[in-house]
Structure formats: structure tokens, C-alpha cells
Amino acid sequence: VPTRVNEYGAVTVVTTNDEIGGESLPLFKDKVDKLFEKGGHQLILDCSELPGVDSEGLEYLLDLQDQCEEHVGALKICGASEALATILRITRLDRRFEFFGDLDEAVKSFG
């Protein structure tokens, strides 16, 4: 299963082992958008298995972050590879997201 969802109380964790972008983006968006519609506004993207993100994928994550913030939530990122962290730093998107080394830290950050 490319994209998995786990609930930790009010926090929803999305883990994917498929690229966020290209041909796989519509399936990922569909799954996450359905979670959001059900009230999942406190989201964590677990990137520990993520092979990559393209520009469309980054744009979607920014849109999702904006939607979460509009509903007094947030999209937080954990387990980002060095390559992903570098991409986010270069594009200055690292300023838009909170990053955590592991899932426990990210879940606890929602209080």
C-alpha cells in the first residue's frame, strides 16, 4: 500500500512510500483530501519512506498547510531525508513547516 494512514487521537499521520508528484500525486491528494474533509486538520506527513517530492507535490503540500491553518490545524513533517530537507531549505519552504526527527516528537508537538 503506497499511502497509509494512522490516527493518534486527534492527530492523523500519513506515510507514503510513493513519490508525492507525477503520476502518483492524484492518488495521494485524493486520500489526503478525504482525510481533511473528515476533520483531519492536525496532520503529520511521515517522510521516512518517501522517495521524493516534485514541484507539483510541494505546491500541494503548501496548499494543504494553508487549509490546515484555516481550520486551526497544521501540517507537520517528520522523518525527512537529507535530500528532502535540502530541497525545502533551497526553496525556503522549510520556513512554512515544522520539522521533527521522529514521529513521537511530531505527535507530541500537537499537545
Where are the regions a protein language model picked out?
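Amphipathic alpha-helical interaction surfaces in cytosolic regulatory modules
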Residues: E19-F97
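Acidic phosphotransfer microenvironment of two-component signaling modules
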Residues: E82, D104-E105
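Short, charged, intrinsically disordered terminal tails
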Residues: A106-F110
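Residue-level detector of flexible, active-site-proximal loop/helix-junction positions
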Residues: T12, I20, D104
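Short acidic-hydrophobic, aromatic-tinged amphipathic segments that line or gate anion-handling sites
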Residues: E98-D102
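Short beta-strand/loop segment at the start of cytosolic alpha/beta domains
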Residues: V1-T15
